[in-house]
């Protein structure tokens, strides 16, 4: 018996148009995008090209018009506030400023989302050990967050994004505050995570990082031009 091999995209954007605030100038004009499981999508573009706005749509911070933004074929314009919150819990996010809790150790920061969801401690331990297979945390997991370097803080941020096995990870300019060596370390972690099946959306304007990813990862490029 013949079966159809249908792939449901995680995210679909169809003919999305949006103008700059207080302007008729188009930020997006009939914009289309499809994000599938296992993708490593790299989004680039100059300032004011729409990168930040795209991230806001993807994390559910901005509401798109009906029939333009879909999560697993469901129109997100129809999502209630509670459904948006559930959707956000299925996303891992990491940003340039890390967003870590300074009164917690790195390990506590990483497992905190699971504690909020009342995940059993045995499951938390298993998930934490799985993350450590991707990121070497042995030298920093009980350290004082305030004493960590930028690269070490970003490792904690990635681990926290990965630990609840999200549908996809949004990394918005994650290397913006890092030196070249730390940037390459973060890139290698993202590549390892993607090779293990994690879906990545990386927003960056770092040319050295882009060149490294082109040579070492199977990426899809999206350049926003405005």
Question: Which role does the model predict for each range below?
Answer:
Residues 75, 122-140:
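Conserved ABC ATPase "signature" region
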């Amino acid at each position: 018996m013949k079966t159809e091999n249908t792939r449901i995209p995680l995210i679909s954007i169809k003919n999305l148009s949006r103008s700059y605030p207080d302007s008729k100038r188009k930020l997006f004009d009939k914009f289309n995008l499809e994000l599938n499981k296992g993708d490593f999508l790299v989004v680039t573009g100059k300032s004011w090209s729409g990168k930040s706005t795209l991230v806001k749509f993807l994390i559910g911070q901005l509401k798109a018009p009906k029939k333009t933004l879909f999560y697993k074929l469901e129109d997100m314009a129809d999502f209630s506030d509670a459904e948006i919150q559930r959707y956000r819990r299925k996303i891992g996010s990491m940003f340039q400023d890390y967003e870590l809790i300074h009164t917690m150790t790195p390990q506590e920061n990483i497992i905190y989302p699971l504690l909020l969801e009342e995940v059993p401690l045995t499951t938390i331990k298993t998930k934490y050990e799985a993350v450590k297979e991707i990121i070497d945390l042995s030298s920093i997991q009980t350290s004082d967050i305030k004493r960590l370097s930028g690269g070490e803080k970003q490792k904690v941020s990635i681990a926290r994004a990965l630990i609840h096995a999200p549908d996809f990870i949004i990394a918005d300019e994650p290397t913006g505050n890092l030196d070249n060596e730390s940037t390459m370390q973060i890139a290698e972690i993202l590549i390892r995570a993607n090779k293990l099946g994690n879906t990545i959306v990386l927003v960056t304007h770092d040319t050295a990082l882009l060149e490294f990813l082109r040579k070492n990862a199977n990426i899809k490029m999206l350049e926003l031009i405005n």
